[in-house]
Design a protein with these regions (language model features):
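Residues at the C-termini of beta-strands that transition into short coil/loop
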Residues: 12, 34, 51, 61, ...
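Short beta-strand and adjoining strand-loop segment in the mid-core
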Residues: 45-75
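Active-site-proximal catalytic alpha-helix in oxidoreductases
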Residues: 96-123, 129-142, 169-170
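NAD(P)-dependent Rossmann-like dehydrogenase/reductase catalytic/cofactor-binding core
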Residues: 124, 131-240
């Protein structure tokens, strides 16, 4: 890791993942990669990648680096990753907006699918799951983004995202796949951080808050199954 030269690319979903990395590597440029692809893990080491790889690349806010320096690093990454121009790899100076835009899907379909164990077509078929859970979460995410200064979303964005997945498959978002395998889910950056950012700005987010509580309960079961949580009441527990 060469200071002022080696570039770190974070392709994880969600918000506020860059803070610990910037603290640990203050002398390295940090790029934000917002990735869109479809993949299903059927068994260990067996993954069906059935959708093109699309990336939007930009820089995380980092006062240690001039904007032009990081822009050049982002374009260099694109040249390395996509040398033959066969992939849709785009430099996006407003990559934070792309992160919030992706959360409109990830913070709604992902957690609800994990909690219910349903694929996206079945959630759409049910109607009430869309009306009572998915669309309200999408609107809460957009409201939080706008309160945080990220704007420019089309009015019909929730309706576009609701209908984004094909209906002729039984596709389950990654969080649902993790839950079915008894694995850990990306709860905090996808759900917890957007919720906290919105609440800090005074945005009412009741649907996402309820879903967040349910996800933490599911995660607790995973921790217990792996010996990472032992049931019991510590001293001063309010519900003992």
């Amino acid at each position: 890791m060469t200071p002022w030269d080696t570039t770190i690319v974070l392709a994880q979903n969600g918000l506020n993942l860059e803070g610990p990395v910037i603290s640990a590597f203050p002398s390295n440029p940090i790029l934000s990669s917002v990735v869109y692809l479809g993949a299903t893990q059927y068994a260990p080491g067996k993954i069906l990648h059935d959708d093109p790889d699309v990336q939007r690349i930009g820089a995380f806010a980092n006062q240690n680096f001039d904007e032009g320096v990081v822009e050049n690093k982002a374009k260099r990454w694109i040249a390395i990753y996509n040398p033959n121009d066969k992939l849709e790899t785009i430099y996006d100076p407003d990559v934070m907006r792309a992160r919030w835009r992706k959360l409109v899907y990830n913070a709604s379909y992902n957690p609800v699918a994990a909690i219910l164990g349903l694929d996206t077509p079945r959630m759409r078929m049910s109607r009430h799951i869309i009306d009572d859970l998915i669309r309200p979460i999408m609107r809460e995410i957009i409201a939080a983004a706008e309160a945080c200064g990220v704007s420019g979303f089309p009015e019909d964005l929730p309706e576009i995202v609701i209908r984004g997945d094909p209906i002729d498959t039984e596709f389950k978002p990654s969080m649902a796949q993790d839950a079915e395998k008894g694995g850990f889910m990306e709860i905090e950056n996808i759900v917890g951080e957007p919720l906290r950012e919105g609440m800090k700005k005074g945005v009412d987010m009741p649907t996402l808050r309820t879903v967040y509580g349910l996800l933490k309960g599911l995660q607790l079961k995973v921790k217990e199954s792996r010996g990472l949580w032992v049931p019991g009441f510590e001293n001063g527990h309010p519900y003992a």
